[in-house]
Amino acid sequence: MGSVRTNRYSIVSSEEDGMKLATMAVANGFGNGKSKVHTRQQCRSRFVKKDGHCNVQFINVGEKGQRYLADIFTTCVDIRWRWMLVIFCLAFVLSWLFFGCVFWLIALLHGDLDASKESKACVSEVNSFTAAFLFSIETQTTIGYGFRCVTDECPVAVFMVVFQSIVGCIIDAFIIGAVMAKMAKPKKRNETLVFSHNAVIAMRDGKLCLMWRVGNLRKSHLVEAHVRAQLLKSRITSEGEYIPLDQIDINVGFDSGIDRIFLVSPITIVHEIDEDSPLYDLSKQDIDNADFEIVVILEGMVEATAMTTQCRSSYLANEILWGHRYEPVLFEEKHYYKVDYSRFHKTYEVPNTPLCSARDLAEKKYILSNANSFCYENEVALTSKEEDDSENGVPESTSTDTPPDLDLHNQASVPLEPRPLRRESEI
């Protein structure tokens, strides 16, 4: 059955190699490629990369170093770990050296470095710079070996011990705070939040919709998760002003609240292409020749730390598959639901998808087919059910009284009550 289904439906797989989009053609006017990211000819640079990093470089920034030093804490949190460790070590070593020099100068001015002098020293057992440096370390780290200690002979030495103790506490608080803030950053949480490689455009509830899929690879939830999307493209205003990247919001249900999602299993985000959509006048051919980028954003609070994280990705116009839907990944088992992430990036082709724009579709310039075809989601569900039954030792039926359409594709006789068949327009 699986081999027959492959011939019947066009599958875009991230696990298969090859690029056949430019060479293969099908009845409804577009090809079928098989690659990790299904694209046509590359036509523009990304503003937001697939991994979420912004493809932007800042040049000719005045007083950049001073501005970064003015916000030193944020700078320490944002820099790489290797530089953070360098700052961590330098902060302590330089403070020890500074106060070691101070105690050595106190001993030098008081004459404690003269071994023949019998008067009471400001700091006992400090008769060299090495001894002063060790005393500085013992004071700031409160080691206290007992050989070197400050006396009441020099008030300035007593003051410096107190001052170094305060400075040491400040350094500890700053460095430890920066390290903890860097460790608690939710940036790495984005590694377990994934977007589909391609976006798709297909009919849903009688309307053309732009869709993409998001998934959470962890069992821990993303609290208050919500999605946003923007279309980026260049344009020229009526006054002749050129805007290199005009940002246009794409409605994903903000007004109705459906932009807030419960991200336990992969969810398909839907943008209805209506009269307020920037894609309203674009047909399949227009999408093929368009030059724009759709930035998708997923935001939410990490359940473990309650810190807000933001995961980003983008789709160029050549990464939008017209007339495709995503393969189902959620299957119902006896006592639980199963998510198959091997199907996460895969799509299948819907042959009767209109190629016109949403405007032409709304103005009845394109007549939708009323033919009822067997829905691919139902076939995948039946296949999953058949595999589970075969594992449990349930024999397949040998009845030949099957409908002609299902008989051609070797459909197994599976009870349909738990999984009622749905028409393609009902998905």
Swiss-Prot record:
What membrane topology does the UniProt entry give?
Multi-pass membrane protein
Recorded hits in SUPFAM superfamilies, A to Z, give: E set domains, Voltage-gated potassium channels
Q: Motif PDZ-binding located where?
A: 425-427
Tell me which parts of the chain lie in the Cytoplasmic compartment.
1-81, 179-427
Q: Which Gene3D superfamilies match?
A: 1.10.287.70, G protein-activated inward rectifier potassium channel 1
Keywords of the record, alphabetical order, are: Cell membrane, Ion channel, Ion transport, Membrane, Potassium, Potassium transport, S-nitrosylation, Transmembrane, Transmembrane helix, Transport, Voltage-gated channel
Q: Which reaction does it catalyse?
A: K(+)(in) = K(+)(out)
Listed GO molecular functions? inward rectifier potassium channel activity; phosphatidylinositol-4,5-bisphosphate binding
The stretches that face the Extracellular side, renumbered to this chain, are: 107-128, 148-156
S-nitrosocysteine modification, residue list: 76
Which Pfam family, any one of them, does this sequence belong to?
IRK_N
Superkingdom of this protein's organism: Eukaryota
Q: Any idea what job this protein has?
A: Inward rectifier potassium channels are characterized by a greater tendency to allow potassium to flow into the cell rather than out of it. Their voltage dependence is regulated by the concentration of extracellular potassium; as external potassium is raised, the voltage range of the channel opening shifts to more positive voltages. The inward rectification is mainly due to the blockage of outward current by internal magnesium. Blocked by external barium or cesium. Probably participates in establishing action potential waveform and excitability of neuronal and muscle tissues.
Family per record: Belongs to the inward rectifier-type potassium channel (TC 1.A.2.1) family. KCNJ2 subfamily.
- What this protein is called in its record is Inward rectifier potassium channel 2
What organism, scientifically named, is this protein from?
Answer: Canis lupus familiaris
Q: Which gene encodes it?
A: KCNJ2
